[in-house]
Amino acid sequence: LRETAEALHSLLAGEAVTFRDYPTLASYFNFNPDRSFHLHFDSKTPTRLYCGGNRPLAMAVGGEFMDGLLFGGEFKAVAATGRLPSLIQIFDDAAKAAGKEEILPKLAQVKLSVSRDREAAREFARVNAGRRILGMRRLGFTSEDIIKLGVQPEEVDRLEIANREGASPHQFGQLVSDTMLDAIFIAGDPGYCRERILEERETAHQHGFRQLKFSELGPDPKESVRLLCEEIIPAL
């Protein structure tokens, strides 16, 4: 993450880079470490690099070397665990220690699935939500954190077993409760989603986020984008 940010900042500033100075990138992408690279165009406007990691080390590196924070798809759940303020503090402290005087911009990603067909919207998001709950455990969130989401650890154990045994998406999804789904996603019809997004906006605002980013959207992308633009965003 650090090498990517440093290399991109140099390239966008019109400088040439040699990947011997970035050994991790050279090894991972199989770059020739002795070749020099530069962009064949000038960056006409400032390009911000946003940190997409949301664990402590990524937050520290992002605050020091990047220009903003995009807190990913577990934003809703992490906020519910109570861990969000301490993670943001790591990011802000690292930025301040690096000499950045202004608070860096922050975006919160909201997992959304909206449709006139409420059940279709919820089923579309179910497997994704379950996999993200599993991911939170693997990233170090504790049983106590999971319980704060209204989910029991043994429910996550069942997901772990199903995933390990190669369950189909349908089989896996049957193990994902509505509580798990709602811990990660805002999923349902436009009226329901609008009210939940207004609540999420307030949570984001309280923690210093000034912009929401929506992902997934729903089972029918065209319908979901239309509903988002016409029936949800105007309320924001």
For the regions a language model picked out, list residue spans one by one:
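Hydrophobic faces of well-ordered beta-strands that scaffold small-molecule active sites
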Residues: 49-52, 69-71, 104-110, 210-214
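Short, surface-exposed connector motifs at secondary-structure boundaries
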Residues: 39-42, 67-68, 208-211
